[in-house]
């Protein structure tokens, strides 16, 4: 695929036209906003722990949550988890993640099949040998019976070995054989798209199918999805598999997904981070939201611009204020998204000295330019490009937060006084 030439406008390219897939109360693809999803790492059979983590992910902003369904106990737990979430007032589509035995679990636990909003199927391990087509067909029949969409998710860590061997043999007979990376890419794409077309032949509508083909290399992922997007009109789920821990996982996922999203490819995303010991699982949700927001695809919470600091900003106060303001607006968005729609598009600036402080603050809806080393101990505040007030004294942080809240009330209140 030849990359497009960017237009003069500083916006992402038009979204790729795909099938629109209804998943619970959400619609994925068909031009709808890119959806953020996540996955639990609890034992699904532990109803209390799994319900708690789904709720945490939902509160952080996950719009769909996937759970492992690997045995009879976990399948039986799904309806109980859904019931507890409903009692908590949480409406979030639950996705069942099936490998090896999904056909049997869905047949044995009809309540699980009914409650799940979508089934994730791995074409690389849905069945082996002669059983593959039979067990794949049973899964599709279940999706048709219960009116559920599916995601056919190929992964280079669990490739269909028979398909891989077949395509490698075909490649060896070429006059000009592809390199190993091209063959791998073809196996992934053929596995996903071919399985989807087989599902359609079995009677599953095209608008109940989402595809993914995940690898752990940035350039490989970009190449796979560009190729797959050119071959089909199915909605696509993006994710860099096994992205890793900490900053490496964040950077790798963002580097790959940002390119694809900019090209209009992708209808739902997950950031597959390895949590650090003791770290909340919700980080993957926050990173996904920030990726979509900083690239101009969606808005979730007011964005805070802050300078990195230099020798002019020896005080840590501006860093602490930037962190406090970011956490404040993120916490408030739980209420603001209902009472003050549009507040999520607001921009704020917390700057540390006079060099870029006033200018950057003028670009924001509301910004503060704190004094740097040797500057007067005053902090001018700019609102919608105009200097509004100068803050002094020991309550600058709280005074600025009050100004932010007042601004939100005046500009975004659903029912202004």
UniProtKB/Swiss-Prot annotation:
InterPro entries (UniProt xref):
Dihydropteroate_synth-like_sf, IspG_bac, IspG_bac-typ, NO2/SO3_Rdtase_4Fe4S_sf
User: What EC number(s) is this enzyme filed under?
Assistant: 1.17.7.3
Which pathway does UniProt place it in? Isoprenoid biosynthesis; isopentenyl diphosphate biosynthesis via DXP pathway; isopentenyl diphosphate from 1-deoxy-D-xylulose 5-phosphate: step 5/6
A single MF term (Gene Ontology)? 4-hydroxy-3-methylbut-2-enyl-diphosphate synthase activity (flavodoxin)
Q: Which residues form a coiled coil?
A: none
Record's keyword terms, sorted: 4Fe-4S, Iron, Iron-sulfur, Isoprene biosynthesis, Metal-binding, Oxidoreductase
- How are cofactors bound according to the entry's free-text note? Binds 1 [4Fe-4S] cluster.
So which cofactors does this thing need?
Answer: [4Fe-4S] cluster
Pfam families, alphabetized: GcpE
Name the reaction it catalyses: (2E)-4-hydroxy-3-methylbut-2-enyl diphosphate + oxidized [flavodoxin] + H2O + 2 H(+) = 2-C-methyl-D-erythritol 2,4-cyclic diphosphate + reduced [flavodoxin]
| SUPFAM superfamilies, per database record | Nitrite and sulphite reductase 4Fe-4S domain-like
Highest taxon of the source? Answer: Bacteria
Q: Which GO terms describe its biological process?
A: isopentenyl diphosphate biosynthetic process, methylerythritol 4-phosphate pathway; terpenoid biosynthetic process
- First-level EC class: oxidoreductase
Q: Which residues take part in binding [4Fe-4S] cluster? A: 307, 310, 353, 360
Biological role stated in the UniProt entry: Converts 2C-methyl-D-erythritol 2,4-cyclodiphosphate (ME-2,4cPP) into 1-hydroxy-2-methyl-2-(E)-butenyl 4-diphosphate.
Q: Which PANTHER family match?
A: 4-HYDROXY-3-METHYLBUT-2-EN-1-YL DIPHOSPHATE SYNTHASE (PTHR30454), 4-HYDROXY-3-METHYLBUT-2-EN-1-YL DIPHOSPHATE SYNTHASE (FERREDOXIN), CHLOROPLASTIC (PTHR30454:SF0)
The entry assigns this protein to a family as follows: Belongs to the IspG family.
| Protein name per the record | 4-hydroxy-3-methylbut-2-en-1-yl diphosphate synthase (flavodoxin)
Identify the species of origin: Xylella fastidiosa (strain Temecula1 / ATCC 700964)
Gene name per UniProt: ispG
């Amino acid at each position: 695929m030849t990359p497009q030439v960017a237009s003069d406008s500083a916006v992402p390219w038009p979204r790729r036209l795909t099938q629109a897939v209804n998943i619970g109360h959400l619609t994925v693809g068909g031009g709808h906003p890119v959806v953020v999803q996540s996955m639990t790492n609890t034992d699904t059979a532990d109803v209390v722990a799994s319900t708690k983590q789904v709720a945490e992910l939902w509160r952080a902003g996950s719009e769909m949550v996937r759970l492992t369904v690997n045995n009879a106990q976990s399948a039986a737990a799904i309806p109980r988890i859904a019931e507890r979430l409903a009692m908590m007032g949480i409406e979030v589509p639950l996705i069942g993640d099936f490998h090896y035995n999904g056909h049997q679990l869905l047949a044995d636990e009809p309540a699980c099949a009914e409650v799940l909003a979508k089934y994730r199927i791995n074409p690389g391990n849905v069945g082996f040998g002669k059983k593959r087509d039979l067990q794949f067909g049973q899964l599709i029949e279940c999706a048709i019976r219960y009116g559920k969409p599916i995601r056919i998710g190929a992964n280079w860590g669990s490739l269909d070995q028979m398909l891989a061997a077949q395509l490698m043999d075909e490649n060896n007979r070429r006059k000009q054989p592809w390199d190993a990376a091209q063959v791998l890419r073809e196996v992934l794409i053929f596995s996903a798209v071919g399985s989807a077309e087989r599902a359609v032949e079995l009677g599953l509508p095209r608008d109940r199918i989402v595809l993914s083909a995940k690898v752990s290399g940035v350039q490989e992922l970009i190449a796979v999805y560009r190729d797959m997007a050119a071959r089909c009109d199915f909605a696509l789920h993006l994710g860099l598999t096994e992205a890793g821990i900490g900053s490496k996982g964040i950077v790798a996922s963002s580097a790959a997904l940002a390119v694809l999203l900019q090209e209009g490819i992708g209808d739902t995303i997950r950031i597959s981070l390895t949590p650090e010991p003791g770290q909340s699982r919700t980080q993957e949700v926050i990173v996904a939201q920030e990726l979509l927001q900083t690239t101009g695809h969606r808005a979730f919470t007011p964005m805070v611009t802050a300078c990195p600091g230099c020798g002019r900003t020896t005080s840590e106060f501006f860093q602490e204020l930037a962190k406090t303001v970011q956490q404040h607006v993120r916490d408030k968005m739980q209420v603001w998204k209902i009472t003050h729609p549009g507040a999520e598009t607001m921009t704020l600036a917390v700057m540390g000295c006079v060099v870029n402080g006033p200018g950057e603050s003028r670009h924001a809806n509301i910004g503060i330019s704190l004094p740097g080393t040797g500057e007067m101990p005053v902090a001018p505040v700019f609102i919608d490009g105009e200097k509004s007030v100068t803050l002094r004294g020991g309550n600058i942080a709280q005074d600025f937060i009050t100004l932010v809240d007042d601004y939100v009330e005046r500009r975004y209140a659903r029912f202004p006084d």
